[in-house]
């Protein structure tokens, strides 16, 4: 899946200035198609710019929530709803995509939002993709990719009904003291990336 929501998240210059073709939404459609990828995920406006032109050439995933780097959300990172199931259907999308931030003070609201949208999407025959990226609250920077935290984030995404889940590759760091004892006592293998992914 080629996800292109960087312009929303980080602004156009930081996202596309090194490759000016990236300013053109059609460039990203073509990149995903020519690379033989499984799908192209983007926010509403980018999909609207090319959905008709590239109809039927690659499955589309509408990213229905987004954040931006202008807001101050160190402890309570969140995302705004920026798309809808009806807009995804109108553009011929195969799925909706949603980001949650487990650990954020806003996480419970985000989980409620995706659960409601997932029900609507599934009722319309669309798949649900969840990007589950722990951050905020009491999670340290190292903890954002800790095995126990990433596993928890993936589990939460599965429990809200995601068909496809994206997490960052976990490190062998264990963030929570309560979890450390379980990993040791149960001899959970986390020595290699392969074992951590399997977990």
Segment roles from a protein language model:
Residues 5-199:
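Alpha/beta enzyme core
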């Amino acid at each position: 899946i080629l996800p292109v929501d960087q312009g929303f998240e980080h602004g156009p210059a930081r996202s596309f200035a090194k490759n000016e073709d990236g300013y053109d939404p059609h460039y990203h459609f073509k990149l995903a198609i020519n690379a033989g990828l499984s799908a192209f995920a983007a926010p509403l406006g980018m999909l609207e710019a090319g959905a008709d032109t590239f109809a039927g050439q690659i499955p589309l995933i509408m990213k229905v929530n987004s954040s931006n780097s202008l807001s101050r959300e160190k402890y309570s990172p969140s995302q705004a709803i920026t798309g809808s199931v009806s807009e995804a259907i109108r553009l011929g999308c195969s799925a909706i995509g949603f980001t949650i931030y487990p650990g954020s003070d806003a996480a419970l609201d985000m989980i409620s939002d995706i659960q409601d949208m997932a029900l609507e999407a599934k009722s319309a025959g669309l798949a649900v993709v969840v990007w589950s990226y722990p951050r905020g609250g009491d999670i340290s920077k190292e903890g954002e990719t800790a095995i126990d935290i990433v596993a928890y984030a993936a589990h939460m995404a599965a429990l809200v009904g995601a068909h496809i889940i994206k997490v960052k590759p976990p490190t062998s760091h264990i963030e929570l003291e309560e979890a450390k004892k379980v990993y040791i006592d149960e001899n959970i293998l986390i020595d290699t990336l392969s074992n951590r992914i399997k977990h």
